[in-house]
Regions:
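Beta-sheet-rich non-transmembrane sensory/scaffold domains
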Residues: 1-261
Length: 261
């Protein structure tokens, strides 16, 4: 008899920060089945003292045809990578779509939408599985429009990047390099490194957040509830970890009034 597993996003508060995992339990016995921590060895400094982030707080999708579970991983904590990870590393698996074997919890593939993110960029948004005709061939794909403003189409079985296009005007990146799969960041986007305010064309809520998007096989279109807004990202020069604070290491009291997006 096949094992039935109930999967759940899981998060825990760690000194004002969030740590996360995806966990499974047998639906028959209730016993823990497997756990996958949403972190890897692409970090620097003593990031574990702050938790690191990586919450799986919203989207998970299951494809019965491929027998894969897709989880969307959240932002880093603190947001400011200079504080979180000594300004270094991609910080896997933050801001990533991760495919897992649902029977074992084993890693299959991942795609990171915002490597080394510093802007509260989550990839927890809805993950839609569909069959699309691309270049004359039907392909099984996953689609996501995460906070960072790009719309991604990936091969559902391998994670291969098929397309990545912005759905609105962005200021943190110009485009996604299709050869590397990485966003090409603008010089001013790394506010934590430049020491200057960065006027983002979207705020920490993102261009698209937890509001559902829809795909119509009849029209071949995806419908996304998108937002346009601005936000001044400024590194907090006086940041100290607190058990009762948001701990973003971003100065929410600052106003970059002289900086135009």
């Amino acid at each position: 008899m096949p094992t039935l597993v109930a999967w759940s996003a899981q998060r825990s508060f760690q000194r004002g920060s969030l740590g996360a995992a995806a966990s499974g339990w047998s639906t028959r016995s209730g016993s823990a089945y497997s756990t996958v921590g949403s972190a890897a060895a692409t970090w620097a400094g003593e990031w574990w003292t702050l938790g690191g982030g990586g919450t799986v707080w919203d989207s998970m999708s299951y494809d019965p045809d491929l027998d894969l579970l897709y989880i969307g991983v959240g932002n880093g904590s603190p947001w400011n990578r200079r504080i979180r990870s000594a300004g270094q590393g991609d910080n896997l698996f933050l801001a990533s779509i991760v495919a897992l074997d649902p029977d074992t919890g084993d890693y299959v593939w991942h795609y990171q939408t915002s490597p080394g993110e510093s802007w509260d960029h989550t990839a927890t948004q809805q993950i839609t599985v569909a069959d699309l005709t691309i270049d004359g061939a039907v392909r099984r794909v996953v689609m996501q429009s995460p906070k960072n403003g790009f719309f991604y189409v990936l091969d559902a079985g391998t994670g291969e990047l098929i397309s990545a296009e912005p759905i609105t005007e962005l200021s943190w990146a110009t485009h996604v390099d299709m050869a590397t799969g990485r966003p090409v960041e603008t010089p001013e986007a790394r506010y934590e490194e430049t020491g200057q305010p960065f006027a983002s064309r979207h705020n920490p809520n993102g261009v698209h957040t937890w509001h559902s998007m829809s795909y119509s096989p009849e029209t071949g279109l995806v419908y996304i509830p998108a937002m346009e807004s601005t936000f001044p990202y400024v590194a907090d020069p006086n940041f100290e970890i607190s058990p009762v604070a948001f701990n973003s290491a971003v100065d929410f009291g600052a106003l970059a009034a002289e900086v135009r997006p």
